[in-house]
């Protein structure tokens, strides 16, 4: 067992954190009041009881809170504020390197709005980081500077009502097959990330694919990942969180993922549905060997996994993180959503260490 005091004392990274799942409850309430957004409660304890619970029955209940957080993050002022507060909160937990991810298309009505959203988040992160980095402690060498980057997300799937951007796309292309629509949207998300980087200097370091995994394969977004690769944007994919090893395989083989978000069902050969993989155990072992050998990093978020994956039974003893480490894989422990999961990086590392 690693002492909690040691975990808290050392500088840490957090490279899998969703902005819209990691805001302060007090800020959510304040922004909702100012923007006339309906909440089920305007009290912190009320929201903890009704929405942001200690435990969730399923993924659907876990995701419910995002309808409220996204609703208050539709303008630059709110995005900048929430990004800055996330840096402040992370600094208090000892984080000194952070990658913040979000899907601009969820918070915008047009491509240009997406660029502005990325810039607003970048401005908020930069301002908060600068306050720390110009402090006396950092200047004297008693503390490390805070470094950060942004990961731009696209969604595996979307439907009408999710955002103004998606509604506009559905209106403009009403007869197009849905898989082609999501492919167009993710490709445009990469182009937005490149534009924000090249026009405004926004440090977009990576591209990610999030959202409903089952039924919406990563391969539908091949063009987006090719575009990201062409523009030197690193590639990660949420995979193996709600589907089996073949989802992780597709993320690596089709999208050239350098990192995998969650990967919880990496070793679950019994969840393979593709009949092309006749020997499921052999395929799973070969995939695990490749991930370990090629240093494809697995971004593990313990609390989030325990809250959304019933098969784990709420027990880290059932989580594959120990097996991943024993396999020689590169594993990065992260928070996922500090608000929704009621967590911080120290708690996540402690859970992983005790698994």
Q: Each predicted region: which residue ranges?
A:
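Metal-cofactor-binding active-site regions of metalloenzymes
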Residues: 1-233, 241-259, 265-355
């Amino acid at each position: 067992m690693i002492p909690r005091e040691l975990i808290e004392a050392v500088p840490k990274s957090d490279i899998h954190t969703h902005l819209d799942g990691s805001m302060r409850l007090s800020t959510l309430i304040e922004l909702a009041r100012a923007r006339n957004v309906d909440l089920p409660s305007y009290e912190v304890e009320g929201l903890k009881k009704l929405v942001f619970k200690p435990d969730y029955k399923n993924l659907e209940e876990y995701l419910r809170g995002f309808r409220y957080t996204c609703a208050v993050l539709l303008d630059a002022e709110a995005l900048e504020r929430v990004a800055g507060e996330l840096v402040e909160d992370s600094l208090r937990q000892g984080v000194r390197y952070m990658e913040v991810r979000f899907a601009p298309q969820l918070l915008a009505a047009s491509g240009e709005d997406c660029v502005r959203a990325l810039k607003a988040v970048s401005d908020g992160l930069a301002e908060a980081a600068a306050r720390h980095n110009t402090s006396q402690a950092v200047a004297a060498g008693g503390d490390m500077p805070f470094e950060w980057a942004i990961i731009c997300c696209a969604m595996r799937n979307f439907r009408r009502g999710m955002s103004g951007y998606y509604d506009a796309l559905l209106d403009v292309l009403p007869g197009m097959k849905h898989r082609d629509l999501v492919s167009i949207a993710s490709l445009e998300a990469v182009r937005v990330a490149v534009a924000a980087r090249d026009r405004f200097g926004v440090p977009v370091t990576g591209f990610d694919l999030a959202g409903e995994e089952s039924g919406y394969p990563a391969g539908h977004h091949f063009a987006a990942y090719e575009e990201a690769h062409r523009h030197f944007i690193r590639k990660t994919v949420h995979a193996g969180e709600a589907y089996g090893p073949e989802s992780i395989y597709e993320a690596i083989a089709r999208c050239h993922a350098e990192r995998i978000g969650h990967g919880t069902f990496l070793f679950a050969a019994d969840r393979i549905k593709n009949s092309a993989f006749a020997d499921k155990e052999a395929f799973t072992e070969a995939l695990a060997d490749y991930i370990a050998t090629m240093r494809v990093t697995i971004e593990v978020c313990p609390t989030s996994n325990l809250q959304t994956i019933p098969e784990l039974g709420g027990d880290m003893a059932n989580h594959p993180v120990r097996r991943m480490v024993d396999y020689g894989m590169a594993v990065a422990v992260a928070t996922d959503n500090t608000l929704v999961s009621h967590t911080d990086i120290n708690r996540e590392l402690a859970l992983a260490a005790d698994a």
